[in-house]
């Protein structure tokens, strides 16, 4: 599905033809990105200046239809010209930089998976795959229906010249939605990389309670290992030759005393009974020395990967974030006027004017379509942020368990502590946003609904009966 969207984006001039190749023909790469906007401007000027063709020139188009058509057309012009100018800005450089960084990240992830022996396990994500394909299929069906309705209505009205009014009606919203589709794809790729890092960190977290270092008891005073002093019966028998048989009872008592001392030393060296009461609360597992690379050896690489993916998120947001602003603004305006026309016009005089019904339904269809695209953008941006935060939470959980590899090597502890501290700075520094005007998360929905409610309260107070009566739509 993403390949279809990329090819369609190339055809309508939203991305360069050879975006992943550096040494190509510059004119050929950016030809469609110049031809299509010029053709759009020609159609826009043809309708607004020459007055040769257009929905507003028809006799059956009343004042409400003309107002709706002008608003839809000029808002689409603002949306399309804005995203086109932003698409020309370092568009090819972004694709090359994104692919290069993504390849480096994937190479390190594969190396970490080999170290953690996760490449031998077949990871299934059926649920995520079904949701992913269903989302793209649903969007494809919605856009197909919107384009079919607009093209069919315009063809019945203008015949073979229907492509001219189509370029100034639905085409700008289609182009803006495709750009947001590119943003959705890149954010989903970033979110998947965060998920892979979290899987590797979770494997370390699961192994933290089952893999320990061997314990060695040291004598604090001598700064060395405790050594036992053993007394053998041979030594005692040798003493008999020098002291005589009369001291036999004395040596027997001394043997018993030294054997008791030896038993006490053995009890001091035996730490197996105290292991169950350890503050670290380890499981009853066999303590063995780690010989070779284990999952925790990936920690330094995983921390670097996390920073690289966050840096990739910054680049992606810098490329597509400015294009979210005009799209969200167009979605907001179209949705408000779609509700207004549906409630104040179509409910009262629906079916009495074909062109008025066409404009009303066009507002409703594209308001629903743009809202769906905006919601998916917000959802994926929230998912990417949540996966990024989950990495820090897993690392913090590992630190709370105090595994042996962290206690025996200060490098791991310092790395984990630095990572959690650095993530706090990242969290305050970056979040997916629209050039700082609003954050791309679920709070944007609440803000938009609140603002739309305020505007609708004002708009719905207008009395449309007099206007509709003057247009002959009401008796």
From Swiss-Prot:
Residues 243-281 are annotated as: Disordered. Residues 251-264 have a biased composition (Basic and acidic residues). Its main location: membrane. Residues 56-68, 150-158, 341-357, 463-475 are extracellular. GO terms for cellular component: axon; cell body; dendrite; membrane; neuronal cell body; plasma membrane. Keywords: Cell membrane, Membrane, Receptor, Transducer, Transmembrane, Transmembrane helix. The chain crosses the membrane at residues 35-55, 69-89, 129-149, 159-179, 320-340, 358-378, 442-462. Disulfide bonds: none annotated. One of its GO terms (biological process) is sensory perception of taste. The keyword Glycoprotein does not apply. Residues 1-34, 90-128, 180-319, 379-441 are cytoplasmic. It comes from the Eukaryota. Disruption phenotype: Impairs avoiding all nonvolatile repellents tested, ranging from quinine to denatonium, lobeline, caffeine, and N,N-Diethyl-meta-toluamide (DEET). Also displays increased male-to-male courtship. It is found in: Cell membrane. Expressed widely in gustatory receptor neurons (GRNs) that respond to aversive chemicals. In larvae, is expressed in neurons of the terminal external chemosensory organ, and the dorsal, ventral and posterior external chemosensory organs. Residues 265-281 have a biased composition (Acidic residues). It is a multi-pass membrane protein. Belongs to the insect chemoreceptor superfamily. Gustatory receptor (GR) family. Gr66a subfamily. This is Gustatory and pheromone receptor 33a. It comes from Drosophila melanogaster.
């Amino acid at each position: 599905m993403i390949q279809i969207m990329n090819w369609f984006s190339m055809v309508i001039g939203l991305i360069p033809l050879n975006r992943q190749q550096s040494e190509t023909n510059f004119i050929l790469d950016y030809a469609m990105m110049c031809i299509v906007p010029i053709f759009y401007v020609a159609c826009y000027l043809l309708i607004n200046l020459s007055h040769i063709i257009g929905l507003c020139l028809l006799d059956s188009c009343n004042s409400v239809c003309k107002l709706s058509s002008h608003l839809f057309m000029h808002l689409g012009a603002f949306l399309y010209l804005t995203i086109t100018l932003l698409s020309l800005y370092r568009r090819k450089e972004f694709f090359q930089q994104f692919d290069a960084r993504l390849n480096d990240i994937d190479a390190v992830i594969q190396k970490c998976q080999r170290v953690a022996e996760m490449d031998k396990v077949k990871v299934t994500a059926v649920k995520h795959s079904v949701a992913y394909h269903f989302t793209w299929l649903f969007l494809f069906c919605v856009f197909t229906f919107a384009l079919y309705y607009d093209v069919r209505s315009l063809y019945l009205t203008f015949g073979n010249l229907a492509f001219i009014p189509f370029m100034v009606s639905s085409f700008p919203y289609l182009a803006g939605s495709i750009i947001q589709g590119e943003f959705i794809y890149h954010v989903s790729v970033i979110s998947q990389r965060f998920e892979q890092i979290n899987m590797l960190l979770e494997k370390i977290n699961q192994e933290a309670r089952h893999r320990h270092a061997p314990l060695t008891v040291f004598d604090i005073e001598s700064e060395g290992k405790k050594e036992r002093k053993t007394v053998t019966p041979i030594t005692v028998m040798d003493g008999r030759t020098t002291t005589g048989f009369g001291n036999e009872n004395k040596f027997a008592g001394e043997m018993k005393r030294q054997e008791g001392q030896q038993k006490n030393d053995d009890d001091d060296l035996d730490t197996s009974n105290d292991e169950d009461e350890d503050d670290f609360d380890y499981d009853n597992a066999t303590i063995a020395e780690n010989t070779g690379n284990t999952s925790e050896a990936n920690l330094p690489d995983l921390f670097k990967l996390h920073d690289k993916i966050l840096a990739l998120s910054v680049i992606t947001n810098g490329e597509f974030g400015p294009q979210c602003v005009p799209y969200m603004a167009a979605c907001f305006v179209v949705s408000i006027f779609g509700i207004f026309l549906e409630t104040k016009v179509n409910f009262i005089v629906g079916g009495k004017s074909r062109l008025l019904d066409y404009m009303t339904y066009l507002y409703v269809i594209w308001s629903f379509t743009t809202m769906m695209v905006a919601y998916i953008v917000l959802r994926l941006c929230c998912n990417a942020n949540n996966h990024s935060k989950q990495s820090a939470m897993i690392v913090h959980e590992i630190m709370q368990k105090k595994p042996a590899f962290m206690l025996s090597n200060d490098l791991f502890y310092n790395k984990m502590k630095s990572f959690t501290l650095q993530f706090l700075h990242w969290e305050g520094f970056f979040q997916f946003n629209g050039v700082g005007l609003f954050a791309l998360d679920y709070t944007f929905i609440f803000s938009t609904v609140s603002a739309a409610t305020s505007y609708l309260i004002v708009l719905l107070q207008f009395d449309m009966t007099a206007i509709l009566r003057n247009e002959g739509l009401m008796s």
